[in-house]
Swiss-Prot record:
It comes from Mus musculus. Acetylated at Lys-253, Lys-253 and Lys-254 under high glucose condition. Acetylation increases catalytic activity. Under glucose restriction SIRT1 levels dramatically increase and it deacetylates the enzyme. This is Phosphoglycerate mutase 1. Gene3D superfamilies: Phosphoglycerate mutase-like. Disulfide bonds: none annotated. The keyword GTP-binding does not apply. The modification Phosphoserine is found at S14, S23, S31, S118. The keyword Cell wall biogenesis/degradation does not apply. The modification N6-succinyllysine is found at K251. The active site is at H11 (tele-phosphohistidine intermediate), E89 (proton donor/acceptor). Substrate binds at residues 10-17, 23-24, 62, 89-92, 100, 116-117, 187-188. GO terms for biological process: canonical glycolysis; gluconeogenesis; glyceraldehyde-3-phosphate biosynthetic process. PANTHER family: PHOSPHOGLYCERATE MUTASE. The gene is Pgam1.
């Protein structure tokens, strides 16, 4: 029997997802469709009767607004929320702002897949002359980060390396206290948590596509090991379509 339940939700589609651009640490907001996804995710949690005690999210508005929208739908906007850069999306470095299909046409789909999906190969770094360098690196929300902590680009391995200490030190104690935890974050920071929970290989986590705006439920034993595979809250068709849409990103438009 499950000792704990954990709910993860990847933010709804952002304005830059809609334009098929690499977002990374750029603070893109939700698109209208992404807002609807978050609403549906919240309604699925409401319909299933979920209650939470504490929430965690990144410092990026697409995840924060997804969380707000979910909390509104379940009428739990009063819950405490912890925001941290450690749950931010992977930093896509010099690729930030580029259209994924155009990048695939220029560098080849195989190279784009390596940058997007390889475990330990980072994209090219974001140099000071990048159009979004000041927008990200000089943003005051990151003023307390040391030079070592503030990335210019990240591989998935790098993203997981900065997300997992927060998971272990801040989130795990809350779960073990019996708190019902909701995490609203990003595809790659959530991948880190999923890889850790399920003990997935580097290859397996690279191929895992988490759908946007759909609550992911884990039932965990007392050692925080899943007692069954992740479950999605939502109808099967919604879940299938969402996962296919994520897999289709980064392919050359025919």
């Amino acid at each position: 029997m499950a000792a704990y339940k954990l709910v993860l939700i990847r933010h709804g589609e952002s304005a830059w997802n809609l334009e098929n651009r690499f977002s990374g640490w750029y603070d893109a907001d939700l698109s209208p469709a992404g807002h609807e996804e978050a609403k549906r995710g919240g309604q699925a949690l409401r319909d299933a009767g979920y209650e939470f005690d504490i929430c965690f999210t990144s410092v990026q508005k697409r995840a924060i607004r997804t969380l707000w929208t979910v909390l509104d739908a379940i009428d739990q906007m009063w819950l405490p929320v912890v925001r941290t850069w450690r749950l931010n999306e992977r930093h896509y470095g010099g690729l930030t702002g580029l259209n994924k299909a155009e990048t695939a046409a220029k560098h080849g789909e195989a190279q784009v897949k390596i940058w997007r999906r390889s475990y330990d190969v980072p994209p090219p770094p974001m140099e000071p002359d990048h159009p979004f360098y000041s927008n990200i690196s000089k943003d005051r929300r990151y003023a307390d980060l040391t030079e070592d902590q503030l990335p210019s680009c990240e591989s998935l391995k790098d993203t997981i390396a900065r997300a997992l200490p927060f998971w272990n030190e801040e989130i795990v104690p809350q779960i073990k206290e019996g708190k019902r935890v909701l995490i609203a974050a990003h595809g790659n920071s959530l991948r880190g948590i999923v890889k850790h929970l399920e003990g997935l290989s580097e290859e397996a986590i690279m191929e895992l596509n988490l759908p946007t705006g759909i609550p992911i439920v884990y039932e965990l034993d007392k050692n925080l090991k899943p007692i069954k595979p992740m479950q999605f809250l939502g109808d099967e068709e919604t879940v299938r379509k969402a996962m296919e849409a994520v897999a289709a990103q980064g392919k050359v438009k025919k």
